[in-house]
Structure formats: structure tokens, C-alpha cells
Amino acid sequence: MLHPWFKYGSQSGLPLAAILFLPALVLADGVVVDRVYDPYVQPLEKELEWRSLVVGDAEDPALDRLQVHRLGVGYGFSDRWSGEIYLIGADGGDSELEVEAAELEAKWQLTEQGEYAADWGLLFELEKEFGENQWEGATTLLALREWGRWVGTANLALGYEWGREIESEWETELRLQGRYRLQESFEPALEFYVGEDYRGAGPVIRGSHRFTGARSLTWEFGVILGLDGVSPEQSWRLLVEYEFF
Amino acid sequence: MIEKIRKNYLSFLLCCMSIVPAAAIAAGGPVVELEIINHLFHPSELIVPANTKVKLIVYNRDQTPEEFESYELNREKVIMGGQRAIIFIGPLAPGEYPFFGEFNPRTAQGKVIAQ
């Protein structure tokens, strides 16, 4: 994901020099909190997805009430590959919400579910910001392991960002989720995020509802709390995904 | 000398013959087959050993795709028309685990019985 904090800094009139010299804040690249991906792909499956993130940090007005919204359309091309296109919008609180970036995403399922001790996949992402010549590419290793009703998922991402107005750099992120499969409509989970200048953990709940005609609606909602002084105090995340064939 | 080599070679062969099948069984595990015909699962009840990982091969004999779906088994797999899919299930505690075909849920019903 591109750095909405950087975008916010640019829009709010902060001098570019100030942005470049505040790496801990601005180039935290910030919004590490995102969904935790499983490594699975279903052929022919179409999906509409809305992801929303709202940051709350009373100590930092520049970040407080920052919103990032992603609207995606996806399709399963085969039993190994799926793709998704996103439009990404941000709203810094004072500014209007507008579409600022687009992202292409491809997921590659490497192993059959349950075949080995863990299931594996790879996620490839390429994001372009419209207003500025700014790009980010990332490859993420997806791993999932079951222990009865418990499911542990890990996403380890290696990304590179470049553009005229930012310093090109490599970055890594780790996202972990431990989930208990209580029932299809309600599953509690704990998530943990580590990125450049970000540490956060918090509870998430998720559920699915099936409709006739092989349609389903999945939702996730949670709050990730910053674990150090640099990370935002709260990152509220919501995901709604409608899947159909 | 030649006799010694021959004996060692025979010992090596015998050793391989005893190890290879054991390894194949250990690596392969139980295999169970399931067919989808006219939007029905055949058989509709699969008996598998408990506490053992099972390789389930699902043949979709219909021309239309079907989705093997089971929250209890934590499995979801689309099988294209006229093709097959491999689904690994378990190890399962003894019990019954229902599954259904999400494209034809009224007819495509079944369960795995682990015992």
C-alpha cells in the first residue's frame, strides 16, 4: 500500500523538505495495518471488496482521523492465480475524499490446502499514485497453518517504492493473525503488525454469510493499537467482501 | 571379491525393496475418491480413518463446475466441469463432517465420517 501519510503531508501543505526529514512519521509508509491474506485462490470466483482504515491519534493532528478507502474488483483466473484491481482514496479529515491511487494485485496459490504442514502462496502488488510520479511494488509471502479450529496466518512483505518526490527505498512488513473458527458467522482473531516505524496489535472479528446462488458476504472489523510512541494510537479497519460466480 | 560385491548389492536391493514401499505408504496416506454426477455426490458418505490426513480426489463428471464446500472441514474448492481436484482433509477427530456443493446445495450433499 502506498503511503497515505505521505499523501496527507503533501496535501496539507507541509513543505516537501520537512516531509523528507521526518522519516519516522511520514515515511513510516505507513499504513501497515491492512488485511491479512490467506494463500488460497478459487477459479471463476468474482469479488467486490471494500476496505476502510481510519486512524485515530490524539497526539498527532496530522494523522488523527486519516481515512484510507480501497474499492476492489477481483477474479479467479485459475485454481492457482487470481487478480484484483483497486482504486484507493484518502481523506485527511479536512480534505475531501478523492481517488488518489490504483493498484494491481495478483495472488499465486503455491500448495494445496492441507497438503503440507503449512499452506503457501505469493502476492504481487503494484501501486501507482495518480497525482505524483510515485510507485510501489511488493511481493508478499503468504503462509497459513491450521491447528484444529485455530488458524495462524503470516504475511511477510518485501516492497520497493520509488518516485520523483520521495526517496526510493526498500521496506518490509510482517502481518500475523491468529483466528479461532468458532462458527462461520463469527470468528474472533488477534492481529499483529510490524512495519517500518510501526508496531501494532489488536482484536479483529470476522464472519461470513452465504446466500443462494453461491454468493457470500464476508466482513472483518477490528482495531489495531499502536505499541510504541511512533505508531498511531488506533487504526480501525473494516473489510466487506462480496463473492459470487 | 566379486562375491562380496554381489552380496552387498543384493543386500542393498533388499534394503531398498523394504524401504521404498514403506516410504510410499507413509508419504501417500489414505486416498478416497468422490464423484459428482448430475449434481450429486457419489458416495454421499465417505468413511475415513480418524486422526489421519486423507487425500480426497473429487471427479466432477458433470459439464458444469461445482464447489466442494464445508465449514466443518475448513475446505472450499471449485472443480471445473469434466475435471478433478485434490483436497487434503484432516487429521480429523472422530465424528461427522458435512459438505455440500455450493452451486447445487439442494442436491449435492454429503458427509465425511471419521472413525
Model regions and ranges:
Chain A
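Cleavable N-terminal signal peptides
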Residues: 15-16, 26
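Transmembrane beta-barrel domains of Gram-negative outer membranes and organellar outer membranes
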Residues: 28-245
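N-terminal secretory signal peptides that target proteins for export/translocation
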Residues: 1-8
